[in-house]
C-alpha cells in the first residue's frame, strides 16, 4: 500500500440548504499531488448519496481516470445506487456511440477543474486504479450490501468493516459463484471480493469491539487469498494482538 494517503477527496457540500455543489478545489487536488497516493473518495461520507447527480459522480470518475498514478478507494453504504450509476454510464456510452470500456473525459471538463495539460483519451474501463468498497458494520448490513456490490462492474471490489460492531461472515462473497467456498481452503483468481478492510470504533461513546471478530475476518481472507487490512482497534492502535496487517491490492 502506498505510504501517502489522503482521506477526504472530492467533497460535495450543501450550500445554504440548497443542492450540493462540486468543490472544484478538492476535486482538482490529485493533479497537484507530487507522489502517487491512495486517496479516499467521499461525499459527506458517500459519493453515491442520492442527492448527487450522475453527472457529478462522472466528473469524479473523470478525474480518477485522468490521474492513473493514484489509487482511489470509494467507500459507500449505497451499492444499489453505485450499480445504477454504472448502468447509467454504460447506457450513456452506448447512446454516444462509444464502447462500454471507453470513458469520455468531457464529463469532467468543468470550469477551473482540469487545465489543458491534463487529458485522457479513452482510458481502460472499468478504471484499474479504483476500488469500490461497500461499508458494513454487522452481518445484516453485509447480507444486504454484498450481493449488490458484486454486481457492480468495477475492476476491484472490497468490503470495509468499520466500525466493526459484531463478528461477520463474508465467506459467501470471497469466491465467485463457480468457485469453491471459503471453507474448502482453495485460494484462486475469482470474481468475489478483492480486499477486506477492518477497524474498530474509537473516541467517546465508542461501541464494543472484540479482537476475535477481526481475527476471524482475517482467517476468512487468508483462506481465500484475499488481502486483509486492519486499520485500528478501539484504542486507535494499528495492530491486532500485536501484529500489523496491511495487505493491499
For the regions a language model picked out, list residue spans one by one.
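Auxiliary Fe-S-binding modules of radical SAM enzymes
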Residues: 147-151, 171-249
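Short secondary-structure capping micro-motifs at structural edges
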Residues: 117-122, 144-148, 183
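Structural preference for beta-strand elements that scaffold enzyme active sites
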Residues: 38-40, 71-73, 129-133, 156-160, ...
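Histidine/lysine/aspartate-rich catalytic loop segments that bind and position anionic ligands
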Residues: 136-138, 142, 150-177, 200
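Active-site-proximal loop/turn and secondary-structure-junction residues that shape catalytic pockets
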Residues: 45, 78-80, 136-138, 163-165, ...
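Pocket-edge structural micro-motifs
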Residues: 29-31, 42-43, 134, 200, ...
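Aromatic/hydrophobic pocket-lining residues that form the small-molecule binding cavity
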Residues: 57, 142, 214
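Conserved Radical SAM active-site core
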Residues: 1-129, 139, 168-178, 190-193
